[in-house]
Amino acid sequence: MTTLPELLQKVVELQGSDLHITTDTPPQIRVHGHLERVDGPAMTAAETKQLTYSVLTDAQKKRFEESLELDFSFGIKGLARFRCNMFNQRGAVAAVYRLIPEKIRGFEELNLPPVLATLAEKPRGLVLVTGPTGSGKSTTLAAMIDKINKERKDHILTIEDPIEFVHQHQGCLVNQREVHSDTQSFSNALRAALREDPDIVLIGEMRDLETVESALRIAETGHLTFGTLHTNSAAQTINRIIDIFPAHQQSQIRTQLSLVLEGIVCQALLPKVGGGRVVSLEIMVPTPAIRNLIREDKIHQIYSAMQTGQEKFGMQTANQSLATLYMKKLITLDSAMTASSNREELQEMINRGVGVVAGAGLGRAGAPRPVGAR
């Protein structure tokens, strides 16, 4: 039987993102968004258990057998790190292994806009990177933390479940805490965080009221705080944070959020023309006008404010990003339309031949044929 390291080696060779192990099928690898089967026979329940247990510690085995679910990460020297979620399905063990490259990619390599570097340079406040699972949030955050690590002399504290990218001490002192290995829970780690003299705090996932409340408090007390949510737009992100609190607290939370928020980056990965994937970004920077809209519970007006904040503040809506990617011939029209939540607006943008690259205008020259053109 093929070993787990051999299968993970194949993930790297194929430039894949995930390895799926489950019964009654060969292992499958996600490559550029699509699952591909590995040559070989279907796996039995005994084989999936043997394969997945091969990298577990005794403590991890015990935890999995008690809860029937397990999140952890591990590294294979010279290859990469992997994040794993193990679970039971139809009474058998299954698992998904997500590739985490050993090398942290920088802003230029990821083609991230300058406004994200500006967010990483903030002395304090709350920066949120959001999007669905597998949209590259961890990769973007790793680039931002790496920039801080190289350029500042501060204490970076991360709380993750599990640790994905490993940051070495560079200009900064870096402490990375993994839930279950280094702390019992996010809430325990966050309660202790302010006693650990941090300057920058990364919260791997803002899952519940206590975690969100802690993030706001840490940002409010003068720390640069990064967090993630599974939301798809800036407005949805703000609403999600406010709605997690009881109704009687929401007015206070709107005010608190309006004061500490420094940026929201919502991202999605799309199939790239010619192979691979490319990131689409919605970026919101809270101007005084936007802070006022948050305070006054006029979240629905933020979208218009973002559209007019392109050149000066580096903001862009998701549709502006999609239009730009299409006009630069990086994605197909079908991909752009599939990813858009307002196809009529996107079609109009493309017909006008107008796009924006995070604060820099994209001219009409070289734009593909507008929608509806013959």
Residue ranges and their predicted role:
Residues 1-374:
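Short, flexible helix-loop junctions that flank or precede catalytic/ligand sites
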